[in-house]
């Protein structure tokens, strides 16, 4: 609810001397946000930000800003990443908070493009480097509801930042952030962790995402903890790199050099005649062949089922700090 240009129901702890929220409903109409957010973050991250930026022009409309959230490629001095945002925080709240510092070009909280689930971080691109630096100095570490946010410059994307986000299952249903830090923190600097919880009860689901600062740290954690029962746990953990959106998974369903359900016949295709199609070998299409084809169809069907029910995993974000 908005009253007099101030957003009510928010408990931000602002530094002393800062004004109230500069946002008002007349400043920006966020109802025109695209519904499909969180496109592929890997090689298509720049295109995603260009297509889905929330450019805030001087008149407050959705601007086609070329200085969009593009992983800091061209605006590393003005583009900020904000971590540890409250799960229910909205884009307009993020804008309202940072607008107290100065004019903003773009801002967005990153979400799953199908479910709208917040990943707990976002980007804010200021109009000037001075305002971006002042935002870090004034807003980094403040409490937003129950979260202490982290504000820093967005790092340029790079190959060295890939494979730093881990997907962990078989965790205890009573796992806490502190326990997760204890288990994984010894292998490197954890820059983000997110325990998935039941939306009705709030209890952990035994699944978490953990992002390390470096790929080597993530790989060390995988080597040390995958298929290992942690202290206080009852099941071996499954620890692997979180999949990127858009990555093909078809190859995992068919093992190479291993025919499924039945043997392929040994008939060979005949040679191509001059102008005529050669005949296939007589033993090529027999009952064994038909069984093999049926087996392949069943295998593909199961693969499609597995693919359709597989949960989309947190996409790669090259700017996660």
Curated annotation (Swiss-Prot):
The keyword RNA-binding applies. Expressed in gonads and somatic tissues of both sexes. In the ovary, expressed in the last egg chamber of each ovariole. Highly expressed in nurse cells with low expression found in oocytes. Highly expressed in testis with lower expression in testis sheath and vas deferentia. Residues 78-156, 164-244 form the RRM domain. The keyword DNA-binding does not apply. GO terms for cellular component: nucleus; ribonucleoprotein complex. Keywords: Nucleus, Repeat, RNA-binding. SMART domains: RRM. Disulfide bonds: none annotated. Pfam families: RRM_1. One of its GO terms (biological process) is sex determination. GO terms for molecular function: mRNA binding. It is found in: Nucleus. Unknown; apparently not involved in somatic sex determination. This is Sex-lethal homolog. It comes from Megaselia scalaris. The gene is SXL.
């Amino acid at each position: 609810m908005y009253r007099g240009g101030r957003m009510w129901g928010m408990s931000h702890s602002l530094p002393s001397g800062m004004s109230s929220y500069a946002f008002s409903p007349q400043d920006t109409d966020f109802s025109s946000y695209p519904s499909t957010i969180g496109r592929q973050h890997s090689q298509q991250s720049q295109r995603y930000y260009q297509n889905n930026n929330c450019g805030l022009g001087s008149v407050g409309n959705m601007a086609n800003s070329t200085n969009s959230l593009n992983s800091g490629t061209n605006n590393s001095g003005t583009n900020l990443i904000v971590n540890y945002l409250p799960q229910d925080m909205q884009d307009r709240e993020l804008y309202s908070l940072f607008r107290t510092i100065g004019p903003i070009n773009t801002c967005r909280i990153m979400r799953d493009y199908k479910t709208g689930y917040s990943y707990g971080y976002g980007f804010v691109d200021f109009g000037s480097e001075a305002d971006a630096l002042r935002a870090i100095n004034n807003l980094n570490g403040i409490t937003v509801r129950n979260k202490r946010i982290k504000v820093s410059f967005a790092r340029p994307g790079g190959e060295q930042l890939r494979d730093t986000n881990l997907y962990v299952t078989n965790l205890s249903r009573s796992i806490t952030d502190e326990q997760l830090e204890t288990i994984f923190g010894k292998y490197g600097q954890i820059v983000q962790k997110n325990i998935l919880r039941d939306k009705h009860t709030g209890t952990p689901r035994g699944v978490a995402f953990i992002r390390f600062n470096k790929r080597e740290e993530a790989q060390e954690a995988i080597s040390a903890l995958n298929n290992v029962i942690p202290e206080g746990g009852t099941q071996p953990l499954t620890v692997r790199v979180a999949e990127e959106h858009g990555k093909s998974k078809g190859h995992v369903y068919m093992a190479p050099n291993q025919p499924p359900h039945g043997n392929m016949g040994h008939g060979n295709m005949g040679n191509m005649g001059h102008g005529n199609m050669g005949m296939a070998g007589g033993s090529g299409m027999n009952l064994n062949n038909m069984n093999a084809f049926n087996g392949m169809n069943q295998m593909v069907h199961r693969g499609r089922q597995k693919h359709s029910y597989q949960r989309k995993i947190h996409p790669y974000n090259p700017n996660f700090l």
